Amino acid sequence: MAKIHVLLKKEELDSQRLPGKVVVVLDVLFATSSIVTALAHGAVEVVPFLNGEAALQEAARRPKGSYVLSGELNAVTLEGFSHPMPMALLGENLAGKALIYSTTNGTVALGKAREADHVYAAALLNGEAMVAQIERVHAGDTVLVVCSGSADNFNLEDFYGAGYLVSLFASRGSAHELTDAAVAARLLHDHTDAMECLSASRVGKMMLSRGLEHEVRFASQKSRFPVVARLEDGSLRRLAP
């Protein structure tokens, strides 16, 4: 029987315990939502970095016009970088290009998960595709659903996203052993509207105060894209259907 854990923040990841595990990273507002959206709109890869300096170094190694450089630090878009939110990235003509991407939490969480056997990026936007991939390829494996959080703090929207994934696992009828955190996440999801929950979160409130309701609403959509984003050799790519 597969076991599903939900970790409340990326700081709970223990690299020594990751071998043999499947890790699914969530940063609903907005890193993993942006990653899924970019791959759904033709980006050939998303290359996540821990900070803007490393992202700039990677960009310098690539031909101009072959990539989009995007990132933020503490919710402020980095100078010289494109805005890192999903709808903003849709205006960047990503088709056929790499997205070089640095964020405060989501890309850091992906980096912390790299010792796992398999690492994926997930959001509300690709929940069904993500769960189907795990059921098809990783049945029986231990799955860690990692909420990125913010600077060692719990984030409501990531926990809601984890609950959506757990709810989808349950709806498929497969037997899973759930930790208490996984059960709690599912209960939150099953009794709360997505937009309501995201808007009530600290990050969601901040985005709304900046006139970015459209970005929050976009990220609140469930299973809009049939995208599976897998991290391999430092790059997130869309798996073929």
Q: What do these predicted regions represent?
A:
Residues I4-H5, K21-V24, V44-V47, G65-L69, ...:
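Structural motif
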Residues E11-Q16, V23-T37:
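Short acidic, Gly/Ser-rich segments with clustered Asp/Glu that frequently serve as metal-coordination loops
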Residues G80-H118, A132, L156-P241:
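Long, charged alpha-helical interface segments
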Residues T103-N105, A123, V145-G149:
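Short, structured patches in soluble enzyme cores that scaffold and shape functional sites
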Residues I134-T142:
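Glycine-rich phosphate/diphosphate-binding loops that line cofactor/substrate pockets in enzymes
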Residues S148-D158:
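Phosphate/ribose-phosphate-bearing ligand recognition and processing surfaces
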